[in-house]
Amino acid sequence: NPVFNEIYQKISNDKETVGVEYQSKLDGDSLLKLLSFNKKRDVFLQRTSVGIHKDDLLFTLEENPLKKYASQGQRKSFLLAIKLAQFTFLKNCLGINPILLLDDIFDKLDPYRVQSLINHLITNFRGQIFISDTHNHRIPGMLSDLGVSHLHKEIIDGKWKK
């Protein structure tokens, strides 16, 4: 998806390439043929052993499987890029800006990736964005430095701090 790739590139500062590949287990055979071939086995097992439910998505980083080769920060960047691509898709389909919730974005991301993410959001997203953080002044400081209008609220023991 070009939108996903573009977002990931911005978060990673064009340092890494990513991909998503659909992997079918049908191996060129028709679904009907595979279901017929496996019918006795499936009845015995009481489950369907072939079909699109066995297909998968392979996520890659620099053409290597993301699960095996990516750091936690790269995995979180990948996940954020997918979420932001979904946001863009919904915005384009519905014609409205969905509310975006980013929970603890500093967890697993280095400050450069967070800065790139915030810059991307400022440039490309309109609407309400809720960002949570475990450090009280980190996000407000970053947003203030960028001249971004924001409302900062602190919750202590489950209650808004006044």
Summary of predicted features, one role per range:
Residues N1-I99, K108, Y112, S116-Q128, ...:
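Conserved NTPase motor "head" modules and their coupling/switch loops across ABC/AAA+ ATPases, GTPases
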Residues D133-H135:
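Conserved H-loop
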Residues D103-I105:
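Walker B catalytic acidic pair
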